[in-house]
Amino acid sequence: MKGLMKYVLLLLSCAALSVSAEDDFGGNISVELSKKLSKKIDISLEEEVRLTQNMSHFDRLASTLGADFKLIKKHLKGGVAYSALLYNEMNYCLLNHRAIATMTGSANAGNFEFSLRARYQATFQDESYGNSHKVNPKQIVRGKASVEYEFAKIKLYPYISAEAYYEIAKKDCNRVKYAVGAKKKIDRHNSVSAGFLFDDKLKSNIYYVQIGYNYKF
């Protein structure tokens, strides 16, 4: 645990040094509960808080309920999820609803695991305060490639990933996320993670420190 805290502090220091005046610095803090219903089906509930404006502004609360289905053992799985997204706007809170479908393929080579994930999401915006989406729902296809390495003796899993966003209505890929970090399995029920994410948007860039906790029933 002391090693993990040192790792988090190092990430915070690096992020603070790398952010320019035009960019933003934030954080993602998440807690996830998951349960295996059968050999092929897992369900999960996640709460995530997102901070922006140099960690001074509560930007979003995301509540996600999902299920994963193993299609080919250890190599292919599908998933569906629903997210309630509460955004903290200037004078009000805005609630969006998001439907998600995913397909993930993975392969192992020694201690390395390579994976590709395709995700479709449709975000429905509450139009009570006006609609910032020109098209409602806003539909996006996301493609993510990641590599993870296993240190089996210490149950540590460093990873690196890149994810591109394609907005269907605009027919444009205008956002890419790059992430690096590590997951640490404490025991058969508890695990923690820490990482750094660079959100490369068309108009602005945001650097995030990510901290997560997972409990498996």
Task: Label the predicted regions.
Residues 113-161, 215:
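Detector for outer-membrane/organellar transmembrane beta-barrel domains
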Residues 25-27, 59-63, 95-99, 135-141, ...:
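Residues that define the transmembrane beta-barrel architecture of outer-membrane proteins
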Residues 20-79, 85-86:
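Start-of-domain marker
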